[in-house]
Every structure is written in C-alpha cells, then in structure tokens.
Swiss-Prot record:
The lineage of its organism: Bacteria, Bacillati, Actinomycetota, Actinomycetes, Mycobacteriales. Keywords: Cytoplasm, DNA damage, DNA recombination, DNA repair, DNA-binding. It comes from Mycolicibacterium gilvum (strain PYR-GCK) (Mycobacterium gilvum (strain PYR-GCK)). Residues 1-63 are annotated as: Domain I. This is Holliday junction branch migration complex subunit RuvA. It holds the Pfam family RuvA_C. Its main location: cytoplasm. Signal peptide: none annotated. Belongs to the RuvA family.
C-alpha cells in the first residue's frame, strides 16, 4: 500500500490536499491542522494510510507516523470508521487523545463528531491498554491484576459507566487481592447496587 506521498502541493481544500508525485495527483484526506502546514506550490511529504473499500480507495495523510498509527489503532474499534478516526485527530492532538482514552474521559471523547456515549465507552475500554493510560486509572492494572480488565468490561457490558466500573473493581481488588474474576464481579456488582 501507499505509506507516504511526497511532491508538489497542487490544491488544498477544507478536508483534503492534492499532491503531485511522479506525475500523478493524489487526493489525500487530512485534518485541518495538517492542512494548515501545507502551502500550494511548495513540496510536502505526508505519512499516509490507504483504506481500501469495496467501492473506494482513500488516502489519509498525517504529519508524522505517530498520528498515522493512532488513526489505525482507532480503526480497530467496532463502529469507528476512517471519518470518525480522522475527526478524533482533528479534535485532539495525539497526546491529548491518548490521555482522554487512557483516563476513560467520556466527556472529552463524546466531543468527537459522531461519537456518542456508548462509542466513547467502547473506545476507552478497547483502547485503554493500547494507547496508554494515566497513573490514576491504572493503579490496579499496575499491581498485576489480570482480572481487572475482564471485570471492568463485564460491568460496562451490564450498563455501568467505565469510570464507575473501574472504581468499583479497583476497590474490590484492593480489599481482596486474591479475588477471582467471578468473585470480583459479584463484589463489584454488590458495591454498585448499593449506590
């Protein structure tokens, strides 16, 4: 696939740029921040991800490979397509987006266009370990509890907010470090039921 494009900038629009490389004009979708760094007539190089669908082949361009890698990671979440992933990177820079996902910050994640509460919870739950998390949300995980993730995931699946599920699971595991998945889930449900 096409990993990068370098050449003269022929045209810049609100959501894409056309870069001529070896006599071919490539339309590359990009965030407004990336597009703002480009100038018509100058040479540019964008790191790209090529998304092939049944009815289209689309290039997405990024200033660096970290942004491209985060874009591809976002695509791994059910319900997140290229336009939402690009919208997330348009809304937040890479470190800020990683922090929001790592912290399970649903308020920040629901500000992304076309991302509702359920999708934000799924983003946080699915990608927390892949994009990194803050020290406050990773206390139990850092302690080596392999059951934390499955318990939190089960609680979210039952309709609890990610933050609630994490707090309850962390309290249960702090009180009983030897808990099994099922005993931790029962204790967390009991704790959440009392609130």
């Amino acid at each position: 696939m096409i990993a990068s494009v370098r050449g003269e900038v022929l045209d810049i629009a609100l959501d894409h740029v056309v870069i001529e490389a070896a006599g071919v004009g490539y339309k590359v979708m990009a965030t407004p921040a990336t597009l703002a760094t480009l100038r018509r007539g100058s040479e540019a190089r964008l790191i790209t991800a090529m998304i092939v669908r049944e009815d289209s082949q689309t290039l997405y361009g990024f200033a660096d490979s970290d942004a491209r890698d985060l874009f591809l990671t976002l695509l791994g979440v059910s319900g997140i397509g290229p336009s939402i992933a690009l919208g997330a990177l348009a809304m937040y820079d890479g470190p800020t987006l990683r922090q929001a996902i790592g912290d399970g910050d649903l308020t920040a994640l629901t500000r992304i266009p076309k991302v509702g509460k359920k999708t934000a919870e799924l983003l946080a739950l699915t990608l927390r370990d892949k994009v990194g998390s803050s020290t406050s949300s990773g206390v139990a995980a850092a302690g080596g509890h392999g059951i934390r993730g499955p318990v939190v995931e089960a609680l979210v699946g039952l309709g609890f907010a990610v933050k609630q599920a994490e707090e309850a699971t962390d309290k249960v595991l702090a009180n009983d470090p030897e808990a099994t998945t099922s005993s931790a889930l029962r204790a967390a449900l009991s704790m959440l039921g009392k609130k």
